[in-house]
Curated annotation (Swiss-Prot):
Organism (species): Rhodospirillum rubrum (strain ATCC 11170 / ATH 1.1.1 / DSM 467 / LMG 4362 / NCIMB 8255 / S1)
SUPFAM superfamilies listed in its UniProt record: Ribosomal protein S16 (SSF54565)
Gene3D superfamilies: 3.30.1320.10
GO molecular-function terms, A-Z: structural constituent of ribosome
Protein name: Small ribosomal subunit protein bS16
Residue stretches of biased makeup (Low complexity): 115-124
Segments for region (Disordered): 88-124
NCBIfam families with a match to the protein in the record: S16
Amino acid sequence: MSLRIRLARGGAKKRPFYRIVVADSRSPRDGRFIEKLGTFDPMLPRDHERRVVLKDERVKYWLGVGALPSDRVARFLGLSGLTEARKVPEQTKQAQPKAKAQERLREAEEKARAAAEAAASAEG
């Protein structure tokens, strides 16, 4: 049985509320789960203390047994200090600005440099 620590959605329409649960990876998202480990309320502000609530000892136990956290839960665990924060991959070549955009950026930098040099020479 492959275990996952993941979010199970609750709450009303347009008012999400999530339970952080340990469940078999084959069970439905909001279906049967083994244990409730905490809650996540995305409607609260990011810095609110009740936005993510976790049972630390139980999370450590399930991680020790081999349960894998989902991406979102792994982020919560990293922020709470229970696991190492996942590393964000560097920008890929495909995500970088295209050639024309890079050329425009270079031209803008050169103009800014020239203006700064002109201002410096005018003062001195």
